[in-house]
């Protein structure tokens, strides 16, 4: 079975016509992908398969990530369900979604695919993220340990500012700053 999954992940991605939804965080790409699916479009939802939203704060509450092998089995099934004569929409991701690695053939196909860029004004993105990540804003203690992972990329002053915004639950400037 494992050999079948690995073959599937090598053979199918180059054979399908991927269209990438790209854009900044908070432009509702996943929601657009899901709406496209409801309207008959073929999609591969990597974030759903990986149980992770792809960002530092992307872990799903009460939903651990699957093993790499289980992710790959689910991905293989999702790819096998695609008609190669039709476009397949997929959200732009890095080659790692949380602890899950996107298989090399799919990653290469994604990098070569045509792309649709989704844009939204900053205020709309902030409002969307505040709603979509309500599980974090309702439990701020979850956020700081995650932000500490950014200490090598941001100054102590920036981390202190984020800490103050979190403590005041002043979400719009915190979200915009991230």
Kindly give the residue locations of the regions a language model identified:
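A general structural motif
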Residues: 16, 85-86, 112-113
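Glycine-rich phosphate-binding P-loop
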Residues: 1, 17-38
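Conserved nucleotide-sensing/catalytic segment adjacent to the nucleotide-binding pocket
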Residues: 38-109
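Short, charged, surface-exposed secondary-structure boundary motifs
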Residues: 3-7, 53-58, 125-128
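Extreme N-terminal, non-catalytic leader segments
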Residues: 1-17
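Conserved NTP phosphate-binding and transfer environment spanning the P-loop NTPase/kinase superfamily
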Residues: 108-115, 119-178
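Hydrophobic/aromatic beta-strand patches that form the interior of the parallel beta-sheet core
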Residues: 19-21, 42-44, 90, 114-118
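Short, acidic/turn-prone active-site loops that include or flank metal/cofactor-
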Residues: 1, 48-51, 121-122
